From Swiss-Prot:
Belongs to the GPI family. The keyword Transcription regulation does not apply. One of its GO terms (biological process) is gluconeogenesis. One of its GO terms (molecular function) is glucose-6-phosphate isomerase activity. NCBIfam families: PRK00179.1 (NF001211). The active site is at 337 (proton donor), 368, 478. It holds the Pfam family PGI. It comes from Novosphingobium aromaticivorans (strain ATCC 700278 / DSM 12444 / CCUG 56034 / CIP 105152 / NBRC 16084 / F199). GO terms for cellular component: cytosol. It is found in: Cytoplasm. This is Glucose-6-phosphate isomerase. Catalyzes the reversible isomerization of glucose-6-phosphate to fructose-6-phosphate. It is an enzyme of class 5 (isomerase). Pathway: Carbohydrate biosynthesis; gluconeogenesis; Carbohydrate degradation; glycolysis; D-glyceraldehyde 3-phosphate and glycerone phosphate from D-glucose: step 2/4.
């Protein structure tokens, strides 16, 4: 379909009536239509999009656009392992890591998982000596996913204490090393290419730390997680400690591959397997459910409606559970690196807004920081609230009751608003929100939540006609940084040259 042909659907959406949320709720069946509970391996998850401006009329146009953009064909291509990452000539086979995909790719993933399990089980059994800590070194997709999963799922303890280090700032690695005993610490080096500057610099420093602290064979305590195993071996890692993953698994979609090694180390293999099972359950829902009952598709339709029709430039995500504190950061990369594009998949200009800015925080902290703008500011910002029915601590249940009360109150207040003769105390209301309520937070639940957002991001990309699986926008800055590091700090604009001179990096 051409850009001009797609534009007719966007024009139709823009021309539809815009009833308020209160008016939409005059339909007694609205809640049943826009809230759904999925029974998943980790327990039920409720997806409630009733407080958004989605309507039967809006969804009908989106369904027609989805058909015109060959959504079903693109979804099938994703699952079957077709080369849908056309700019790099690759498939995007993260679902195969969860057992959903073409037979050959699933078998390859299962073999790699079996290899990973053998190593994880051996370490936990003490076959490699005493291992109390793991410093996991990666960046971007090699770090954000493991950090989220470990922070969310090990608050009650872990089989091995995992410290995720991503920043090139030495303060990050130094803090991790201070918390570990070199004699009982393993180092995991996670890099798809095994050339990432930040990761390899941190890895070299970690090796030196082991060496300086009396470890006779530092490489004996290193595991490599990479799609370039030959480079890991060349760097010095024993071949038996290299856990490869397929080139067709993108970095920000790689948590399900050997990049999940630190998660398995922390949880044990059963926990990691449950994590995969939860994600696979969402895969099956995404594949099998029709558009009207597909919670993934509905979420993407809402995202697109607010960005493309209502002109919203951001969307906010607030986790009303401390264990999900890192989820907004994870979603920032997933959504903005995937869909923050300026061209269509065929290279022609994208004439509509691409991904909104994704941001957020943790409730109730965020209420005392940014909710003033959400309720009374001039920006319309759709909000996602995430909450967990079962508390994650042993303190007085009043803590959790207050937490959930605040979560649900915010959604109600955004919608209802409050009139006042004093403008400073008036709330306009009619501000959209969606709520995702998990019965419990466990490995399977978290896997389901992440897979839900992966597919949500993919649907938005299909509807816009863009490729969500490349990320060339990150390359220019890295190339310039390497130029500066090699002494080429000349030929820049006056501001950059002055900054380089101020820190002694001028050429």
């Amino acid at each position: 379909m051409t850009v001009a042909e797609a534009e007719t659907y966007w024009t139709a959406l823009a021309g539809l009536p815009r009833p308020t949320l209160k008016e939409l709720f005059s339909d007694a069946g609205r809640l049943d239509r826009y809230a759904a509970t999925l029974d998943l391996p980790g327990g039920p998850i409720r997806f409630d999009w009733s407080k958004t401006h989605l309507s039967a009329e809006v969804e009908a146009v989106f369904a027609a656009l989805a058909s015109a953009m060959d959504f079903e064909g693109r979804r099938a291509a994703l699952i079957e392992g077709a080369k849908i990452n056309n700019t790099e000539g690759r498939a995007a086979e993260h679902t195969a890591q969860r057992g959903i995909g073409n037979e050959a790719s699933v078998e390859e993933a299962e073999a790699l998982h079996a290899r990973m399990r053998m190593l994880v089980d051996a370490i936990h059994a003490g076959a490699l000596g005493e291992v109390r800590s793991l410093i996991h070194i990666g960046i971007g997709g090699s770090a954000l996913g493991p950090a989220l999963a470990i922070d969310a799922l090990t608050r009650d303890g872990a089989k091995v204490a995992v410290h995720v280090v991503s920043n090139i700032d030495g303060c990050a690695l130094e803090a991790a090393m201070k918390a570990c005993d070199p004699a009982t610490t393993m180092i995991a080096v996670a890099s798809k290419t095994f050339t990432t500057t930040e990761t390899m610099t941190n890895a070299a420093s970690a090796l030196e730390w082991l060496r300086e602290n009396g470890v006779a064979d530092p490489y004996g305590q290193v595991v490599a997680l990479t799609a370039a195993p030959e480079k890991a071996v060349e760097w010095g890692v024993d071949e038996t400690r290299v856990l490869p993953f397929s080139e067709t698994v993108g970095g920000r979609y790689s948590l399900w591959s050997s990049i999940g090694f630190p998660v398995a180390m922390a949880l044990g293999w059963e926990g990691f397997a449950a994590f995969l099972d939860g994600a696979a359950a969402i895969d099956r829902h995404f594949i099998d459910a029709d558009l009207a009952g597909n919670v993934v598709v509905r979420a993407a339709f809402a995202d697109l409606y607010y960005t493309q029709v209502r002109g919203c430039q951001t969307r906010a995500v607030f986790a009303y559970d401390e264990r999900l504190a890192l989820l907004p950061d994870y979603l920032q990369q997933l959504e903005m690196e995937s869909n923050g594009k300026r061209v269509l998949a065929d290279g022609s200009p994208l004439t509509r807004p691409s991904a909104p800015v994704t941001w957020g925080g943790v409730g109730t902290d965020a209420q005392h920081a940014v909710f003033q703008l959400l309720h009374q500011g001039t920006h319309l910002i759709p909000v996602d609230f995430l909450a967990v029915k079962t508390q994650g601590h042993d303190l007085d249940p009043a803590h959790h009751q207050i937490l959930l009360s605040n979560c649900f109150a915010q959604g109600a207040a955004l919608m209802a608003g409050k009139a006042s003769d004093d403008g400073a105390r008036a709330y306009p209301g009619d501000r959209p929100s969606a709520t995702i309520l998990c019965d419990d937070l466990n490995p399977a639940t978290l896997g389901a939540l992440i897979a839900f957002h992966e597919h949500r991001t993919f649907v938005s990309a299909v509807m816009l006609g863009i490729n969500p699986f490349d990320q060339f926008g990150v390359e220019l800055g890295k190339a310039i940084a390497k130029q500066i590091e090699s002494g080429g700090g000349e030929g820049f604009d006056p501001s950059t040259e002055a900054l380089l001179a101020a820190v002694g990096l001028a050429g």
